[in-house]
Every structure is written in C-alpha cells, then in structure tokens.
C-alpha cells in the first residue's frame, strides 16, 4: 500500500527516544485507532514538532502513513496540551494508566470506536481536578468490554433482578441478588454499597458523572474489587499500574 499524507485528530502518549534526535510516540486517534509515529528531529533545540508531541498534547496531526508499521509526522495544527496531566504527578499516573489500558486492548490502526470519546472525556475531567481515582475506575470497568471480558452488572446472573442488594462473583462474572446469596457459594461477600458504586460506574455514561464526593473507604474498596477483576480476567501486569499503586502508598 502506497504511503499518503493524512490529517488525524488525536492525543499523544508514550513518548520515547528513537535514533539520535527523533522520538517515537503513540497517538490515539478518533478515526484510525492507536498507532506509532516517528517525530523526526524532536529532540533538537527549538523543534516545533517536538513541542507539539509532548505527552498529553492533542489536536490535528498530518502524518505520512500506509496504515501499518510506523507512520511519520509531517506537521500539525491547533495543538493544545492537557497541562495538568503533564505537570501533576498523580494526575499523570492515573492518565498514563488509563491510556495504557486502552493501548493494550487494541491492535494498531484498529478503530477504537466510542472508547476515543470515553478516554478524552476522562482525561479532561482528570485535568480539570475531578476525582481521578473514580474516573479511572469508571474507565477500567468500561474497558473490560474492549477486552471481551465484561462482567454482567446490569442484572442478577440467576434471576435477572435489576434492583435491590447485590454481591459479586468473580468466578461467575457478574452480580448476584440477595434472593440468591445462599445458593451461590462463589461470591465475594461485599458491602452492597461497594457493588452499587461499581454498578453505577460501569453502567452510567461518563457525561452523567458529576463532581461527586465518594467516601474514601468506599472508593478504596471498589478499586480493590475492580483490580481483582483485572487480575482474574486479564492479568496484564502493566508498569503504569504498578507505579500508580506505589504512588498510593505515600
């Protein structure tokens, strides 16, 4: 396939040195998925391309590509940066993990569909100071769909009940209503409030997530359950997740 110049709308992440003065960076795009671009001369002093491809920069990028392998950045326009994600260590850690999860869910150049808007909205919320942990938990739950291991959280696995108190079963991959607690041995015996929060984050659109304050212990408990889902269903062992967990210890 011949190479062509194409304008893509996207966000830059995962930047690393390549050759003497170049960098390779990943870009998450609205219509062409995630792929790698070679930013030539990015490490040279006063490089315009380098400044426009710092992590968490977003805008329109003109690339030379044949839609496989490494594409090459030619120029850009209307580029801005989510500066708080770049400057604030905690926001950076959460955002890097969110993007890493997305990156591992798709092969390069595959359309990521509605997940583009989900991630952009999540990053904008984190950048503006909203609860990064809760936003990340929401993205974690929704991205399980991209991995093909989404649990059933909208209704009881046994009877289909949608309201009431629920528990969760890792083995069965979904929620159990209180009518069937005694008939299911493989449940986690969670506080119903934890399950309710997880259900809300999984089922509600991110646009409806306002600036809410969640009890710190409840937020911690829901995070542990979601982490167990990822370990049981995927076991990704991402460096960004390990760093985020280490950061939480301080």
UniProtKB/Swiss-Prot annotation:
GO biological process: DNA recombination; double-strand break repair
Entries under SUPFAM superfamilies matching the protein: ArfGap/RecO-like zinc finger (SSF57863), Nucleic acid-binding proteins (SSF50249)
A single Gene Ontology CC term: bacterial nucleoid
Keywords: DNA damage, DNA recombination, DNA repair
Protein origin, superkingdom: Bacteria
The keyword DNA damage is assigned to this record: yes
Keyword match DNA repair: yes
Family annotation (Pfam families): RecO_C (PF02565), RecO_N (PF11967)
Function: Involved in DNA repair and RecF pathway recombination.
HAMAP family per record: RecO
Family affiliation: Belongs to the RecO family.
Protein name: DNA repair protein RecO
Gene designation: recO
């Amino acid at each position: 396939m011949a190479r062509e110049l194409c304008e893509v709308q996207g966000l830059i992440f995962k930047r690393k040195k390549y050759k003497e003065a170049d960098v390779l960076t990943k870009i998450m795009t609205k219509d062409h998925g995630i792929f790698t671009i070679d930013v030539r001369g990015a490490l040279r002093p006063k490089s315009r391309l380098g400044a426009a491809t710092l992590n968490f920069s977003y805008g329109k990028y003109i690339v030379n590509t044949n839609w496989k392998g490494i594409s090459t950045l030619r120029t850009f326009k209307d580029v801005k940066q989510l500066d708080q994600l770049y400057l604030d260590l905690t926001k950076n850690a959460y955002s890097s993990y969110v993007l890493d999860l997305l990156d591992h869910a798709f092969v390069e150049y595959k359309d990521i569909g509605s997940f583009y808007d989900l991630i952009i909205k999540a990053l904008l919320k984190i950048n503006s100071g909203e609860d990064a942990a809760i936003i990340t938990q929401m993205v974690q739950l929704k991205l399980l769909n991209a991995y093909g291991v989404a649990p059933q959280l909208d209704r009881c696995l046994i009877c289909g009940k949608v309201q009431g108190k629920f528990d969760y079963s890792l083995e069965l991959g979904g929620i159990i209503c209180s009518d069937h607690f005694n008939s299911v041995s493989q449940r986690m015996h969670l506080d119903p409030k934890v399950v309710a929060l997880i259900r809300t984050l999984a089922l509600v659109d991110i646009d409806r997530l306002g600036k809410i304050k969640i009890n710190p212990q409840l937020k911690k408990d829901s995070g542990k359950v979601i982490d167990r889902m990822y370990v049981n269903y995927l076991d990704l062992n991402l460096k960004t997740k390990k760093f985020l967990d280490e950061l939480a210890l301080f």
